């Protein structure tokens, strides 16, 4: 097996996947597939529940969802349909919100209009281990169109995955019959989950050897940390299972262990100056979505290679 020429550690097998991380080929991830219509500040207020959220619960965390008018900067051409109205219609179609957040803003006059995110589930898309989630992004200040992404939620570890581009994104501009187009887009994402399930099941059927797992972990580290500097944690740390059921060699388990360890933090690390520290959880919503999406694309690229 040939050696990856740009890996930080010689002798690792080249899995034949390429990644545009810092413009250096290593593993395959399409950056343009990770472009979001919204950008979120770090440490955005987040609320996630085991039961559908009420309007009062949502309003306490993300008041911009209930804006009664667009921001004053919007022109008359801006078709204003509040996210709360769209949410109510989605509820009528069986979609319920289980997580909400909105970005922090420096200007108070934009707080009630700023970008926000809702993760919704349909009653038909929940099973014992995972739930399909539609990730809805929007704003009322012109900084974001309506955008819907596909995601999964693992109950065992409370991890919110993002399904790369296995399921197509849907974007709805603030023009015309916005609510109808958003509902149509939600069903489009919903019907695309079969492809995500096929990818997940195929990952479960693929066994990785130690070298392949290490290469996957190395590429995952490059997605989060500057490739020009040594990562503060090692491949073996992010491959370490946090529960017995995840101690498996299949690609799905390797992917989930890597995702959880990179996003939840809590690992003993060494800074560039040699000081000991503990990795922090990924709290920025935009950063979280981008990293999770990139990790899915990484795993799915390996799945396709191993098929």
Where are these regions (language model features)?
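Intrinsically disordered, low-complexity regions enriched in serine/threonine
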Residues: 34-40, 124-128, 140-143, 152-307
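Generic low-complexity, intrinsically disordered sequence content enriched
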Residues: 19, 32, 57, 91-94, ...
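Acidic/proline-rich low-complexity IDRs
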Residues: 11-17, 86, 297, 304
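Short, Lys/Arg-enriched N-terminal segments with co-localized hydrophobic residues
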Residues: 13-33
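Feature for intrinsically disordered/low-complexity regulatory segments and propeptides
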Residues: 34-84, 88, 98, 109-110, ...
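Amphipathic, interaction-prone secondary-structure segments
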Residues: 80-88, 92-145
């Amino acid at each position: 097996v040939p050696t990856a020429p740009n890996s930080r550690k010689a002798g690792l097998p080249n899995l034949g996947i390429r990644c545009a991380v810092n413009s250096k080929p290593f593993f395959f991830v399409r950056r343009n597939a990770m472009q979001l219509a919204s950008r979120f500040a770090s440490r955005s207020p987040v609320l996630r529940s085991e039961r559908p959220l009420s309007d009062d619960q949502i309003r306490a965390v993300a008041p911009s969802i209930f804006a009664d008018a667009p921001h004053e900067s919007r022109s008359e051409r801006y078709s204003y349909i509040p996210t709360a109205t769209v949410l109510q219609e989605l509820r009528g179609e069986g979609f319920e919100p289980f997580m909400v957040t909105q970005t922090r803003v420096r200007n108070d006059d934009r707080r009630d209009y700023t970008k926000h995110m809702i993760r919704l589930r349909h009653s038909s898309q929940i099973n014992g281990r995972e739930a399909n989630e539609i990730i809805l992004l929007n704003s009322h200040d012109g900084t974001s169109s309506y955008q819907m992404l596909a995601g999964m939620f693992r109950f065992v570890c409370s991890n919110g995955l993002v399904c790369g581009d296995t399921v197509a994104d849907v974007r709805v501009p603030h023009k015309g019959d916005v609510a109808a187009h958003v509902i149509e887009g939600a069903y489009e994402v919903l019907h695309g989950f079969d492809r995500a399930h096929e990818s997940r099941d195929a990952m479960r059927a693929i066994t990785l050897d130690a070298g392949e797992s290490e290469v996957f972990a190395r590429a995952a580290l490059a997605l989060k940390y500057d490739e020009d500097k040594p990562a503060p944690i090692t491949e073996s740390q992010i491959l370490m299972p946090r529960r017995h059921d995840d101690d498996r060699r299949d690609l799905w388990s390797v992917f989930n262990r890597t995702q959880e360890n990179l996003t939840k933090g809590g690992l003993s690390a060494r800074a560039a100056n040699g000081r000991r520290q503990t990795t922090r959880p990924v709290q920025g919503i935009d950063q979280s979505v981008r990293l999770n999406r990139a990790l899915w694309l990484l795993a799915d690229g390996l799945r396709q290679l191993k098929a």
